UniProtKB/Swiss-Prot annotation:
<comment type="pathway">
    <text>Amino-acid biosynthesis; L-histidine biosynthesis; L-histidine from 5-phospho-alpha-D-ribose 1-diphosphate: step 7/9.</text>
</comment>
<keyword id="KW-0663">Pyridoxal phosphate</keyword>
<dbReference type="InterPro" id="IPR004839">
    <property type="entry name" value="Aminotransferase_I/II_large"/>
</dbReference>
<dbReference type="InterPro" id="IPR015421">
    <property type="entry name" value="PyrdxlP-dep_Trfase_major"/>
</dbReference>
<dbReference type="GO" id="GO:0004400">
    <property type="term" value="F:histidinol-phosphate transaminase activity"/>
</dbReference>
<dbReference type="InterPro" id="IPR001917">
    <property type="entry name" value="Aminotrans_II_pyridoxalP_BS"/>
</dbReference>
<dbReference type="Pfam" id="PF00155">
    <property type="entry name" value="Aminotran_1_2"/>
</dbReference>
<keyword id="KW-0032">Aminotransferase</keyword>
<protein>
    <recommendedName>
        <fullName>Histidinol-phosphate aminotransferase</fullName>
        <ecNumber>2.6.1.9</ecNumber>
    </recommendedName>
</protein>
<comment type="subunit">
    <text>Homodimer.</text>
</comment>
<dbReference type="InterPro" id="IPR015424">
    <property type="entry name" value="PyrdxlP-dep_Trfase"/>
</dbReference>
<dbReference type="GO" id="GO:0030170">
    <property type="term" value="F:pyridoxal phosphate binding"/>
</dbReference>
<keyword id="KW-0368">Histidine biosynthesis</keyword>
<dbReference type="InterPro" id="IPR005861">
    <property type="entry name" value="HisP_aminotrans"/>
</dbReference>
<dbReference type="InterPro" id="IPR015422">
    <property type="entry name" value="PyrdxlP-dep_Trfase_small"/>
</dbReference>
<keyword id="KW-0808">Transferase</keyword>
<dbReference type="GO" id="GO:0000105">
    <property type="term" value="P:L-histidine biosynthetic process"/>
</dbReference>
Length: 348
Protein backbone atom coordinates (compact mmCIF):
# COMPACT_ATOMS: atom_id res chain seq x y z
CA UNK A 1 0.00 0.00 0.00
CA UNK A 2 1.21 3.50 -0.78
CA UNK A 3 2.53 5.37 2.28
CA UNK A 4 -0.24 7.98 1.95
CA UNK A 5 -1.07 10.28 4.84
CA UNK A 6 -4.23 9.13 6.62
CA UNK A 7 -5.96 12.46 6.11
CA UNK A 8 -5.32 12.31 2.36
CA UNK A 9 -6.40 8.69 1.94
CA UNK A 10 -9.64 9.33 3.82
CA UNK A 11 -10.59 12.49 1.90
CA UNK A 12 -12.78 12.23 -1.21
CA UNK A 13 -11.32 14.13 -4.15
CA UNK A 14 -12.87 17.47 -5.07
CA UNK A 15 -15.28 17.12 -7.99
CA UNK A 16 -14.98 19.98 -10.50
CA UNK A 17 -17.66 20.88 -13.01
CA UNK A 18 -17.76 18.80 -16.17
CA UNK A 19 -15.59 19.97 -19.06
CA UNK A 20 -17.03 18.58 -22.32
CA UNK A 21 -14.51 17.02 -24.68
CA UNK A 22 -16.61 17.55 -27.81
CA UNK A 23 -17.78 20.74 -29.48
CA UNK A 24 -21.35 21.97 -29.57
CA UNK A 25 -22.23 22.12 -25.88
CA UNK A 26 -23.83 25.14 -24.26
CA UNK A 27 -21.80 25.26 -21.06
CA UNK A 28 -23.74 26.66 -18.11
CA UNK A 29 -22.22 24.55 -15.34
CA UNK A 30 -18.99 26.10 -14.06
CA UNK A 31 -19.77 29.81 -13.62
CA UNK A 32 -17.38 31.00 -16.29
CA UNK A 33 -17.87 34.42 -17.83
CA UNK A 34 -19.76 34.04 -21.14
CA UNK A 35 -18.04 37.08 -22.64
CA UNK A 36 -14.37 37.17 -23.70
CA UNK A 37 -11.90 39.75 -22.43
CA UNK A 38 -11.22 42.72 -24.73
CA UNK A 39 -8.79 42.02 -27.56
CA UNK A 40 -6.57 44.89 -26.36
CA UNK A 41 -5.30 42.89 -23.38
CA UNK A 42 -3.40 40.58 -25.74
CA UNK A 43 -1.22 43.41 -27.10
CA UNK A 44 1.86 42.39 -25.08
CA UNK A 45 1.35 38.64 -25.31
CA UNK A 46 3.93 38.03 -28.06
CA UNK A 47 6.60 39.84 -26.05
CA UNK A 48 5.96 37.51 -23.12
CA UNK A 49 5.87 34.40 -25.29
CA UNK A 50 9.39 35.22 -26.41
CA UNK A 51 10.45 35.26 -22.73
CA UNK A 52 8.92 31.97 -21.62
CA UNK A 53 12.39 30.46 -21.11
CA UNK A 54 12.83 32.98 -18.26
CA UNK A 55 11.21 32.80 -14.85
CA UNK A 56 8.37 35.26 -14.20
CA UNK A 57 8.41 38.00 -11.59
CA UNK A 58 8.31 35.95 -8.36
CA UNK A 59 6.19 38.50 -6.49
CA UNK A 60 3.90 39.65 -9.34
CA UNK A 61 4.88 43.24 -8.58
CA UNK A 62 3.19 45.02 -11.49
CA UNK A 63 0.00 42.99 -11.14
CA UNK A 64 -0.21 43.68 -7.41
CA UNK A 65 0.47 47.39 -7.93
CA UNK A 66 -2.26 47.59 -10.57
CA UNK A 67 -4.70 45.85 -8.23
CA UNK A 68 -3.67 48.16 -5.40
CA UNK A 69 -4.48 51.25 -7.47
CA UNK A 70 -7.82 49.81 -8.56
CA UNK A 71 -9.00 48.71 -5.12
CA UNK A 72 -7.44 51.44 -2.99
CA UNK A 73 -5.24 49.05 -1.02
CA UNK A 74 -1.48 49.17 -0.50
CA UNK A 75 0.45 46.75 -2.71
CA UNK A 76 2.05 45.14 0.34
CA UNK A 77 -1.46 44.22 1.53
CA UNK A 78 -1.93 42.02 -1.54
CA UNK A 79 -0.71 38.54 -2.39
CA UNK A 80 -1.23 37.13 -5.89
CA UNK A 81 -1.98 33.47 -6.40
CA UNK A 82 -2.64 30.75 -8.93
CA UNK A 83 -6.37 31.38 -8.73
CA UNK A 84 -8.16 32.21 -5.49
CA UNK A 85 -8.02 28.48 -4.62
CA UNK A 86 -4.28 29.02 -4.19
CA UNK A 87 -5.03 31.83 -1.73
CA UNK A 88 -7.31 29.52 0.28
CA UNK A 89 -4.58 26.89 0.47
CA UNK A 90 -1.89 29.41 1.39
CA UNK A 91 -4.03 30.78 4.23
CA UNK A 92 -4.72 27.29 5.53
CA UNK A 93 -1.06 26.24 5.39
CA UNK A 94 0.08 29.50 6.98
CA UNK A 95 -2.24 29.77 9.96
CA UNK A 96 -3.63 26.32 10.80
CA UNK A 97 -1.65 23.47 12.30
CA UNK A 98 -2.82 19.91 11.59
CA UNK A 99 -5.44 18.90 14.18
CA UNK A 100 -6.49 22.52 14.72
CA UNK A 101 -9.98 23.58 13.65
CA UNK A 102 -11.33 25.13 10.46
CA UNK A 103 -14.95 26.30 10.23
CA UNK A 104 -17.31 26.96 7.33
CA UNK A 105 -21.00 26.70 6.48
CA UNK A 106 -22.73 23.37 5.94
CA UNK A 107 -23.64 24.43 2.40
CA UNK A 108 -20.91 26.35 0.60
CA UNK A 109 -17.94 25.93 -1.73
CA UNK A 110 -17.00 22.29 -1.23
CA UNK A 111 -13.27 22.88 -1.73
CA UNK A 112 -13.07 24.35 1.79
CA UNK A 113 -13.76 20.93 3.29
CA UNK A 114 -11.48 19.12 0.85
CA UNK A 115 -8.40 21.23 1.52
CA UNK A 116 -9.04 21.31 5.28
CA UNK A 117 -9.28 17.52 5.47
CA UNK A 118 -6.19 17.01 3.32
CA UNK A 119 -4.35 19.39 5.66
CA UNK A 120 -5.40 17.27 8.64
CA UNK A 121 -7.54 19.97 10.24
CA UNK A 122 -10.60 19.38 12.37
CA UNK A 123 -13.82 20.36 10.60
CA UNK A 124 -16.56 22.49 12.16
CA UNK A 125 -19.67 23.07 10.04
CA UNK A 126 -22.17 25.77 10.88
CA UNK A 127 -25.79 25.15 9.85
CA UNK A 128 -27.76 27.36 7.51
CA UNK A 129 -31.55 27.60 7.65
CA UNK A 130 -34.09 26.25 5.16
CA UNK A 131 -33.32 29.24 2.90
CA UNK A 132 -29.60 28.37 3.05
CA UNK A 133 -28.85 31.55 5.02
CA UNK A 134 -27.11 32.26 8.32
CA UNK A 135 -29.37 32.91 11.28
CA UNK A 136 -26.72 34.66 13.31
CA UNK A 137 -22.97 35.31 13.56
CA UNK A 138 -20.54 32.42 13.75
CA UNK A 139 -19.15 32.20 17.26
CA UNK A 140 -16.40 29.60 17.23
CA UNK A 141 -13.46 30.41 19.53
CA UNK A 142 -11.68 27.15 18.68
CA UNK A 143 -11.52 27.86 14.93
CA UNK A 144 -8.10 29.03 13.75
CA UNK A 145 -9.61 29.89 10.35
CA UNK A 146 -13.18 30.50 9.20
CA UNK A 147 -13.99 30.30 5.48
CA UNK A 148 -17.03 32.36 4.47
CA UNK A 149 -18.05 32.98 0.86
CA UNK A 150 -20.09 36.09 0.15
CA UNK A 151 -21.95 35.75 -2.18
CA UNK A 152 -22.17 32.16 -1.01
CA UNK A 153 -22.53 29.30 -3.47
CA UNK A 154 -24.63 27.52 -4.45
CA UNK A 155 -27.32 30.04 -3.44
CA UNK A 156 -25.52 33.12 -4.75
CA UNK A 157 -26.57 35.56 -2.03
CA UNK A 158 -24.40 37.70 0.21
CA UNK A 159 -24.22 36.63 3.82
CA UNK A 160 -25.88 39.03 6.23
CA UNK A 161 -23.44 41.92 6.67
CA UNK A 162 -24.18 42.40 10.37
CA UNK A 163 -23.58 38.70 11.02
CA UNK A 164 -20.30 38.89 9.13
CA UNK A 165 -19.22 41.92 11.14
CA UNK A 166 -20.01 40.14 14.40
CA UNK A 167 -18.19 37.01 13.22
CA UNK A 168 -15.04 39.00 12.48
CA UNK A 169 -15.27 40.97 15.71
CA UNK A 170 -15.62 37.84 17.85
CA UNK A 171 -13.26 35.46 16.04
CA UNK A 172 -10.17 34.39 17.95
CA UNK A 173 -8.60 33.22 14.69
CA UNK A 174 -8.74 34.52 11.13
CA UNK A 175 -11.78 34.99 8.90
CA UNK A 176 -11.32 34.54 5.15
CA UNK A 177 -14.13 36.14 3.14
CA UNK A 178 -14.22 34.58 -0.30
CA UNK A 179 -15.47 37.19 -2.79
CA UNK A 180 -15.22 35.09 -5.96
CA UNK A 181 -18.59 36.39 -7.20
CA UNK A 182 -18.66 39.85 -5.68
CA UNK A 183 -18.43 41.82 -8.93
CA UNK A 184 -21.88 40.59 -9.93
CA UNK A 185 -23.37 42.18 -6.79
CA UNK A 186 -23.74 45.67 -5.34
CA UNK A 187 -21.67 45.12 -2.19
CA UNK A 188 -18.23 44.01 -1.05
CA UNK A 189 -16.29 43.77 2.19
CA UNK A 190 -13.06 45.61 1.43
CA UNK A 191 -13.94 48.10 4.16
CA UNK A 192 -13.49 45.29 6.71
CA UNK A 193 -9.73 45.44 6.13
CA UNK A 194 -9.42 48.82 7.84
CA UNK A 195 -11.48 47.72 10.85
CA UNK A 196 -10.48 44.10 11.50
CA UNK A 197 -6.88 42.90 11.62
CA UNK A 198 -7.94 39.25 11.38
CA UNK A 199 -9.65 39.39 7.96
CA UNK A 200 -8.43 38.05 4.63
CA UNK A 201 -10.45 38.75 1.48
CA UNK A 202 -9.90 36.54 -1.54
CA UNK A 203 -10.78 37.48 -5.12
CA UNK A 204 -10.49 35.64 -8.42
CA UNK A 205 -10.16 36.83 -12.00
CA UNK A 206 -11.78 33.64 -13.29
CA UNK A 207 -15.38 34.80 -13.11
CA UNK A 208 -15.73 38.53 -13.56
CA UNK A 209 -12.56 39.10 -15.62
CA UNK A 210 -13.03 36.18 -18.06
CA UNK A 211 -9.65 34.61 -17.20
CA UNK A 212 -10.66 31.21 -15.80
CA UNK A 213 -8.15 29.50 -18.07
CA UNK A 214 -5.22 31.47 -16.63
CA UNK A 215 -5.79 30.97 -12.89
CA UNK A 216 -5.24 34.34 -11.21
CA UNK A 217 -6.41 35.30 -7.73
CA UNK A 218 -5.65 37.73 -4.92
CA UNK A 219 -5.60 37.82 -1.16
CA UNK A 220 -6.14 41.19 0.54
CA UNK A 221 -5.22 41.53 4.22
CA UNK A 222 -3.08 43.41 6.72
CA UNK A 223 0.64 43.70 6.04
CA UNK A 224 1.33 41.33 8.93
CA UNK A 225 -0.91 38.63 7.47
CA UNK A 226 0.45 39.02 3.93
CA UNK A 227 4.03 38.86 5.21
CA UNK A 228 3.39 35.43 6.72
CA UNK A 229 1.39 34.13 3.74
CA UNK A 230 4.19 35.18 1.41
CA UNK A 231 6.52 32.72 3.16
CA UNK A 232 4.20 29.85 2.27
CA UNK A 233 3.44 30.89 -1.31
CA UNK A 234 5.08 28.63 -3.88
CA UNK A 235 8.03 30.15 -5.70
CA UNK A 236 7.04 31.68 -9.04
CA UNK A 237 3.42 30.78 -8.33
CA UNK A 238 2.02 32.90 -11.17
CA UNK A 239 3.40 32.51 -14.69
CA UNK A 240 4.37 35.48 -16.85
CA UNK A 241 1.48 35.02 -19.32
CA UNK A 242 -1.04 35.12 -16.48
CA UNK A 243 0.62 38.15 -14.89
CA UNK A 244 0.66 40.08 -18.17
CA UNK A 245 -2.92 39.39 -19.21
CA UNK A 246 -4.32 39.84 -15.69
CA UNK A 247 -2.58 43.21 -15.33
CA UNK A 248 -3.99 44.32 -18.68
CA UNK A 249 -7.47 43.08 -17.75
CA UNK A 250 -7.48 45.15 -14.55
CA UNK A 251 -6.55 48.20 -16.61
CA UNK A 252 -9.68 47.56 -18.73
CA UNK A 253 -11.92 47.60 -15.67
CA UNK A 254 -14.52 49.78 -17.40
CA UNK A 255 -15.04 47.16 -20.11
CA UNK A 256 -15.66 44.47 -17.52
CA UNK A 257 -18.11 46.66 -15.59
CA UNK A 258 -20.26 46.66 -18.73
CA UNK A 259 -19.94 42.87 -18.92
CA UNK A 260 -21.06 42.51 -15.30
CA UNK A 261 -24.11 44.63 -16.04
CA UNK A 262 -24.98 42.41 -19.01
CA UNK A 263 -24.71 39.34 -16.79
CA UNK A 264 -26.98 40.92 -14.18
CA UNK A 265 -29.61 41.78 -16.79
CA UNK A 266 -29.57 38.26 -18.22
CA UNK A 267 -29.70 36.82 -14.71
CA UNK A 268 -32.86 38.79 -13.97
CA UNK A 269 -34.49 37.66 -17.20
CA UNK A 270 -33.65 34.01 -16.51
CA UNK A 271 -35.04 34.16 -12.98
CA UNK A 272 -38.29 35.72 -14.20
CA UNK A 273 -38.66 33.22 -17.06
CA UNK A 274 -38.06 30.17 -14.88
CA UNK A 275 -40.49 31.37 -12.23
CA UNK A 276 -43.12 31.78 -14.95
CA UNK A 277 -42.52 28.12 -15.82
CA UNK A 278 -43.18 27.11 -12.22
CA UNK A 279 -39.60 26.79 -10.98
CA UNK A 280 -38.60 27.74 -7.45
CA UNK A 281 -35.71 30.16 -8.01
CA UNK A 282 -33.73 32.01 -5.37
CA UNK A 283 -32.67 35.60 -5.93
CA UNK A 284 -28.98 35.78 -6.77
CA UNK A 285 -26.10 38.23 -6.50
CA UNK A 286 -23.70 36.03 -8.47
CA UNK A 287 -23.31 34.84 -12.06
CA UNK A 288 -25.46 31.78 -11.44
CA UNK A 289 -28.85 30.85 -10.02
CA UNK A 290 -30.17 27.93 -7.99
CA UNK A 291 -33.49 26.60 -9.29
CA UNK A 292 -35.84 23.71 -8.52
CA UNK A 293 -38.01 22.45 -11.41
CA UNK A 294 -41.69 21.51 -11.18
CA UNK A 295 -43.03 18.14 -12.39
CA UNK A 296 -39.66 16.39 -12.78
CA UNK A 297 -36.62 15.88 -10.56
CA UNK A 298 -33.55 18.06 -10.80
CA UNK A 299 -31.45 15.06 -11.82
CA UNK A 300 -33.87 14.26 -14.66
CA UNK A 301 -33.76 17.87 -15.85
CA UNK A 302 -29.96 17.75 -15.74
CA UNK A 303 -29.89 14.54 -17.79
CA UNK A 304 -32.40 15.72 -20.37
CA UNK A 305 -30.57 19.01 -20.83
CA UNK A 306 -27.31 17.12 -21.26
CA UNK A 307 -28.93 14.98 -23.97
CA UNK A 308 -29.61 18.29 -25.72
CA UNK A 309 -25.97 19.32 -25.26
CA UNK A 310 -26.70 21.85 -22.51
CA UNK A 311 -24.70 21.48 -19.31
CA UNK A 312 -25.93 22.74 -15.95
CA UNK A 313 -24.67 21.65 -12.50
CA UNK A 314 -26.42 19.02 -10.43
CA UNK A 315 -25.28 18.25 -6.88
CA UNK A 316 -26.14 15.08 -4.95
CA UNK A 317 -25.97 16.95 -1.65
CA UNK A 318 -29.20 15.98 0.17
CA UNK A 319 -30.17 19.57 0.91
CA UNK A 320 -30.05 20.67 -2.72
CA UNK A 321 -30.74 17.45 -4.61
CA UNK A 322 -33.96 18.99 -5.94
CA UNK A 323 -32.09 21.94 -7.45
CA UNK A 324 -29.83 22.64 -10.40
CA UNK A 325 -27.32 25.46 -10.53
CA UNK A 326 -27.33 27.37 -13.80
CA UNK A 327 -24.50 29.69 -14.81
CA UNK A 328 -25.52 32.89 -16.55
CA UNK A 329 -24.59 32.69 -20.23
CA UNK A 330 -25.10 35.03 -23.13
CA UNK A 331 -28.66 35.94 -24.06
CA UNK A 332 -28.46 33.46 -26.92
CA UNK A 333 -27.32 30.66 -24.62
CA UNK A 334 -30.10 31.41 -22.15
CA UNK A 335 -32.65 31.46 -24.99
CA UNK A 336 -31.46 27.98 -26.00
CA UNK A 337 -31.71 26.80 -22.39
CA UNK A 338 -35.25 28.13 -21.96
CA UNK A 339 -36.40 26.59 -25.23
CA UNK A 340 -35.00 23.22 -24.15
CA UNK A 341 -36.66 23.47 -20.74
CA UNK A 342 -40.01 24.33 -22.33
CA UNK A 343 -39.65 21.30 -24.59
CA UNK A 344 -38.77 19.04 -21.64
CA UNK A 345 -41.65 20.39 -19.56
CA UNK A 346 -44.06 20.11 -22.49
CA UNK A 347 -44.94 23.80 -22.41
CA UNK A 348 -44.10 24.67 -26.02
Amino acid sequence: MLPTRDCVRQTPAYTPGEQPQTAGFTKLNTNENPYPPPAEIFAHLQEQLEKVRLYPDPISKELRQTAAELYGIAADQIIAGNGSDDILNIALRTFVNPCESVAFLDLTYSLYETIARVHGANIIEFPTNDKFALEGPIICPEAKLIFLASPNPPLGKHLDRDYLEATCANASGLVLIDEAYVDFSDDNHLDFLSRYDNVIISRTMSKSYSLAGLRVGFGFASRAIIEQMDKVRDSYNLDRIAQTLATAALKHHNYFEQVWQKVRQTRGRLITSLRELGFIVFDSEANFILASPPQISASELYNQLKERQILVRYFKHPRIQNYVRISIGTDGEIDRLLSAIQEIMGTN
